[in-house]
Amino acid sequence: EKKLSYPVELKIGTYTVVCEVTNKETGYFNLTEFSLKVTSAFSEGFYILKETTDGNTDMDFYNDRQKTVIPDVIASVQGEAQSGKPCNMCPVYNKIYIDPATAKSTYATGVFVTSGQNEFSIYSTIDMSTLFDRSSLLFSEMDGEEVPYAMVSAMRGNMLFSNKGVRLDDLGGGSFASEYSTGKLGYPAGKGTSSFIQAYDGQNLSFWSGETRRLMYTSGSDMEEIKYKDGYEGVKVDWEQAAPVASGWNHRAGKNTIWYLFDVAGEGRYVVVLQPGGGIDQVIRLDASLHLAKADVIAGNALT
């Protein structure tokens, strides 16, 4: 009987470990396997975006396994909170970056946080170090007029949405990723976007464009308007007067429902329902007495 000890130097994730034991005299052997889950202090739980008492941005982390809370994770690691009031937070999967310890390309799950007028950082869920910010995500420092809204992971890669358009980056470990990838982003495609982003189909994401004032979809390399489905004769939205309020994606009984909520000046609120990959399927003008027609904080239930 031996006590085995083996150092684990693996990325966060779930692995299958196979052990083989061989009898030196007979040559008989036996195999056994087990699952190994590699985690970090910041990889299993929930991030809570918050405004600090002095008006800046930080996050608390709730560890779901240990039922504990780590407060102020940005300030505790970075030495100070992120400047400006919090705006948005997104998970970014398989984000490529250069590991400063090895100077080689690698990848990790990140948390994209925007604050103030145009500040953002991508923090590693391994140790909350900064993977990228305004000074490092592009091949040159980001233009002062660019406003990043969100970074979203999709089938083709990670997409940065800003008022300049969409920038696409390969997923680390994916079939298109190169061992020489740096994670930096090139020129944007299309026109200005917003923070209202949802799925659309297996390849594309839908979003509200603040520049074209239309619902659009993108694969990261181009943009197209989402039009009413063929033969649509229902209620329509005056896009020029519409202001986005919320968006969501619901999955129920095997059906995906993607929706956007708009406030139209002088008319009230409308719910726009998309048919995945097929255009605008339905528009519902809300009764002014409904809570949804007046609420300030709205969230969608992703899975019922």
Residue ranges and their predicted role:
Residues 23, 61-63, 275, 287:
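Residue-level signal for short segments within beta-strands and strand-turn junctions
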Residues 60-86:
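Short, flexible N-terminal segments of the mature chain
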